[in-house]
Amino acid sequence: MKHFLRMLIQVCLYFYCKFLWRCLKFVMRKLTGRCELQRICYNTKPGASRTMKIETSLRDSKSKLLQTSVSVHPDAIEKTIEDIMELKKINPDVNPQLGISLQACLLQIVGYRNLIADVEKLRREAYDSDNPQHEEMLLKLWKFLKPNTPLESRISKQWCEIGFQGDDPKTDFRGMGLLGLYNLQYFAERDATAAQQVLSDSLHPKCRDITKEEISKFSKAEWEKKRMDKAIGYSFAIVGINITDLAYNLLVSGALKTHFYNIAPEAPTLSHFQQTFCYLMHEFHKFWIEEDPMDIMEFNRVREKFRKRIIKQLQNPDMALCPHFAASEGLINM
């Protein structure tokens, strides 16, 4: 009974707040002579702040036209803007900038949805060793990361040198499908210097000094074992696939809207997503070294802490993950 009453109160509060919000919108329109979309465009600077407010306004509207506008085909955006202006009785000759601002926002909103679909398609496509294109991408990954070391054979223990778990990398792509390979190749090709440096660090990590306090807790045998385990390296390719999973979840959850709406003046593309992966890979490597973990068994703890830090950064509406490496030179700031 208590649960039912609690649910009933929550439902009543929801509709009450919704009613008050509609009343406020009506009063604001009468006072300013502008609809909510106009007020947002005129009072909010371009970027994530404006686009996310426009997106919320369109989705929460009682108008079917406005609700469906966030999922129209990119080619239909211009016509959709005209229909919205007509519905809101806004003269485009008197308010020419409004149409331009709304179009920019819709391009980002629709583009983000389409980007999720593109990324999901790659994630669902399994690596196929009988597919020449898949094989070519994998071999290119080796060449970009190990340009001076020829691969002796397709099935080889050499793959472990770039962080795969066995002698055939295809089994490591099961979780993220082709998306993991696409991201790794992009990083290795577009930011070769940084990728090779990260790989080198992962293979030849700095040693972690054990403090006297830590030594006192171990027996001689335990200390000798700990002394041998204190390196902080990791498997480059496996971590890259794991960071791909992180980037994917940030995208699908909507957390990356802040970043993409601030750096992509129109529709965010797969290249923007791959550049974001490069940034995350670069930052995670620095974060891993700063955290100074005892061994690879602490990976999940460090990754979760890193994820929370990125999410906190993305909660800032002005946030754009900094393009400070070669792969992101093409990013355009708004």
Curated annotation (Swiss-Prot):
InterPro entries: ELMO_dom, ELMO_domain-containing. Residues 133-314 form the ELMO domain. The keyword Cell membrane does not apply. Keywords: GTPase activation. The keyword Electron transport does not apply. GO terms for biological process: cilium assembly; protein transport. GO terms for molecular function: GTPase activator activity. PROSITE patterns: ELMO. GO terms for cellular component: cilium; glutamatergic synapse; Golgi apparatus. Transmembrane segments: none annotated. Acts as a GTPase-activating protein (GAP) toward guanine nucleotide exchange factors like ARL2, ARL3, ARF1 and ARF6, but not for GTPases outside the Arf family. PANTHER family: ELMO DOMAIN-CONTAINING PROTEIN 1, ENGULFMENT AND CELL MOTILITY. This is ELMO domain-containing protein 1. The lineage of its organism: Eukaryota, Metazoa, Chordata, Craniata, Vertebrata.
